């Protein structure tokens, strides 16, 4: 293990401890653990604090981690440096988030006014944190989306990768905000194979008010579905925000597991959904968060000993079990005569290989993946 890798592991452990406290069944902070985490951060150099902040930002947990840290530092004498550092970083991040939500709201309303059904997916799951881009799902056609974004907001359409075209995704850059707005049009999944599941996102969406603005967002079950597609069937890694977001849903009993199973089976991804939940429960357990997952869910997990591992800045999913889950999804599409999925899912392995080759050659897979 290199010094850099060891340092990242140390920072990730600190972040996990700060963020995951209070997300277990007891939903309470451990004073001894918080004080230990505070001491660990207090001992960091200026460069160490910068690296710690970068890791928190990459995992979309900056606000949650620093809020806990700031409260602890303010309550214990001798940590003025950490208090000041937290205040500065939080003020900057909250300003970014506020601007992003203010810019997203009129886009959302304009799409609705154009006759589109629309929901904000993934982005608001991390609240009070926010991701590095903003995701929308809509049933509208791409011409409507492009017309609204370009004509009403002077947005610049970003170049589309092969993966974007398969998934029917479009990215737009607004002059007023640094984050991209990514619009998923009519389908979900890396190859755009999920049509029925995508329809459920709108049919079962719920209202949510954020920053004084109202949005439709996926119901908890569809949140799990969307993140499973992203983490288990596409990226093969989790951000720490995923662990915190879904640990909180499990803690609060917000997930209807019968409804979740019904939805996942429609898309042929029930084993992947069950694996997704197991990985979350197993990871947060190491930080004192005891979460219960029904036995009927765990029975659908093909590899009960699967665990995430730290690789780079994220928590990686082992490729072997993930390949098995992909094969299971493809077989399910065949059994159910899902022609769209049957024709599109086989395109995923060559797409992934092309992305890997592009990354190895150029250090960037954006034109492919």
Located regions from the model:
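Conserved NTP-donor binding/palm subdomain of two-metal-ion nucleotidyltransferases/polymerases, i.e.
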Residues: 2-132, 138-369
